[in-house]
Amino acid sequence: MKLFLAAIVLCATAATAFPSELAQRAAGDLSKRQSITTSQTGTNNGYYYSFWTNGGGEVTYTNGDNGEYSVTWVDCGDFTSGKGWNPANAQTVTYSGEFNPSGNAYLAVYGWTTDPLVEYYILESYGTYNPSSGLTSLGQVTSDGGTYDIYSTQRVNQPSIEGTSTFNQYWSVRTEKRVGGTVTTANHFAAWKALGLEMGTYNYMIVSTEGYESSGSSTITVS
């Protein structure tokens, strides 16, 4: 009986001794997974993250543990989201997860360079619309167990990391979709350069989920 009473006293003491610590832990866990619905950038668990939306529909972005993020969208306008690095380099990217679009959406290693200003996509998967439709392939690059068609187009007076600008957009589009694997970005950058597609100083690079006038969900972990 004395042992039983002692155990009760110890449990009661523990329950009263640590409420603030438990609250701090709960608050910390909540902040790590706080949902975001307006455009912002920042750092989370050692990774750069970027979330941009034009405000259309319902889009909710959530930073998870380490390199994980998730995003859900319903009848969205246009958004881009993801985790990665800033500044980036010609690095090898590994990612895994789930990508479940209904309509037009992209899963890509996505980023920018400056001087010159360039927006680029290494497209791993997409929804109902292939963004290379209507474009002429400039060539191909074989990398990481797959073949990618290369495209270039110009964007005129469009949003960019330098405000509304005119800039080149480069694409490597994987011929067989996948969700998960390794992307050796240096192979794509070298192939683009060989075709005369010049890049500048690396800005940010993320594994991006992007949606346009669609619905869906995506949970991705980068490393």
UniProtKB/Swiss-Prot annotation:
According to its UniProt record, the EC number is 3.2.1.8
Instruction: Output the Gene Ontology terms for molecular function.
Output: endo-1,4-beta-xylanase activity
Region annotation (Interaction with protein inhibitor XIP-I) maps to 5-7, 18-23, 85-87, 123-130
Q: Which organism is it from?
A: Talaromyces funiculosus (Fruitlet core rot fungus)
Q: How does activity depend on temperature?
A: Optimum temperature is 55 degrees Celsius.
- Partners and quaternary state? Interacts directly with the wheat xylanase inhibiting protein I (XIP-I).
- What does the record say about activity regulation? Strongly inhibited by wheat xylanase inhibiting protein I (XIP-I), and by proteinaceous endoxylanase Triticum aestivum xylanase inhibitors I and II (TAXI-I and TAXI-II).
Q: In which pathway does it act?
A: Glycan degradation; xylan degradation
Its keywords, alphabetically, are:
Carbohydrate metabolism, Glycosidase, Hydrolase, Polysaccharide degradation, Secreted, Signal, Xylan degradation
Catalyzed reaction equations: Endohydrolysis of (1->4)-beta-D-xylosidic linkages in xylans
**Family membership noted in the UniProt record:** Belongs to the glycosyl hydrolase 11 (cellulase G) family.
Q: Where in the cell is it found?
A: Secreted
**Entry-linked InterPro entries:** ConA-like_dom_sf (IPR013320), GH11/12 (IPR013319), GH11_AS_1 (IPR018208), GH11_dom (IPR033123), Glyco_hydro_11 (IPR001137)
Biological processes annotated in GO:
xylan catabolic process
| Biological function | Endo-1,4-beta-xylanase involved in the hydrolysis of xylan, a major structural heterogeneous polysaccharide found in plant biomass representing the second most abundant polysaccharide in the biosphere, after cellulose.
Report the active site residues: E119 (nucleophile), E210 (proton donor)
Every copy of the GH11 domain together lies at: 35-223
| Transmembrane annotation, as ranges | none
Lineage in the entry?
A: Eukaryota, Fungi, Dikarya, Ascomycota, Pezizomycotina
Protein name per the record: Endo-1,4-beta-xylanase C
Has UniProt tagged this entry with the keyword Isomerase? no
